[in-house]
């Protein structure tokens, strides 16, 4: 584990409960994977956009802000999460908070490109991360204004490795956090197909079966990295229990993606 990861993990582990230790360790593994990919793809702008951060302490870009001199935009649509994030991220970043713009806005297909233009991002950024437990697929599909070098996006392992499906687009969709319904997001296969259409290569997933990693095709070719097949890399979300009755019920509402 690198010195930089240890630095941020110390801040995160402060005042943490025992029940959250495993979650935090999985977060640190994900951060290490991000650094590994950046090492091979290279860094050009040190700019990022992250959509969906909860309280900001375990999102994908705070470490880049804290320890590597990056700057960018974090967006959180949930008002409660946003207010917590303002406090947590300031504790983590200190003076480096000046390099972050934090927005409280509910992202939709209609407003996403306007948000990006309004915040004056160049078309090429190093990293885009999407984790909103809902319209992730539809937001990535709608983005036209930027061409990130790397995309990290949440997939729903509940839908399995073979089904290419998403939830139906609803601009007001909010995941039922309390009951943890499996109806949210998109399958890994659906995201793989979308990535191909947008000229991105699926290169891997994290060990928790939550996040998929994509690299822009022109960069993947430069480092001789071939796209992975879903069947070879698919992993289940280890923290979510499976209820076959729930699964069968939710599957009836899914939208197949070709």
Regions found by a protein language model. Name each.
Residues 67-68, 146-147, 198:
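Short, structured coil segments at secondary-structure junctions
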């Amino acid at each position: 584990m690198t010195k930089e990861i240890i630095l941020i993990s110390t801040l995160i582990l402060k005042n943490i409960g025992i029940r959250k230790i495993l979650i935090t360790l999985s977060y640190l593994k994900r951060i290490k994977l991000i650094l590994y990919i950046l090492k091979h793809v290279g860094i050009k702008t040190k700019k990022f956009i992250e959509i969906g951060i909860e309280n900001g302490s375990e999102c994908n870009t705070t470490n880049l802000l804290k320890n590597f001199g990056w700057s960018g935009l974090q967006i959180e649509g949930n008002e409660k999460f946003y207010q917590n994030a303002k406090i947590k991220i300031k504790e983590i970043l200190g003076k480096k908070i000046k390099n972050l713009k934090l927005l409280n806005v509910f992202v939709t297909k209609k407003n996403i490109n306007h948000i990006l233009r309004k915040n004056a991002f160049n078309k090429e950024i190093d990293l885009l991360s999407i984790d909103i437990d809902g319209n992730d697929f539809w937001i990535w599909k709608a983005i036209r204004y930027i061409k990130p070098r790397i995309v990290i996006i949440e997939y729903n392992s509940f839908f399995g490795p073979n089904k290419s499906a998403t939830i139906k687009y609803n601009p007001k969709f909010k995941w039922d956090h309390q009951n943890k319904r499996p109806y949210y997001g998109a399958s890994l296969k659906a995201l793989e197909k979308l990535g191909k259409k947008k000229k991105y290569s699926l290169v891997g997933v994290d060990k928790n079966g939550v996040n998929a990693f994509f690299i822009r095709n022109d960069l993947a070719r430069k480092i001789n990295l071939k796209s992975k097949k879903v069947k070879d890399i698919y992993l289940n979300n280890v923290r979510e229990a499976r209820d076959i009755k729930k699964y069968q019920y939710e599957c009836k509402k899914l939208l197949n993606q070709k």
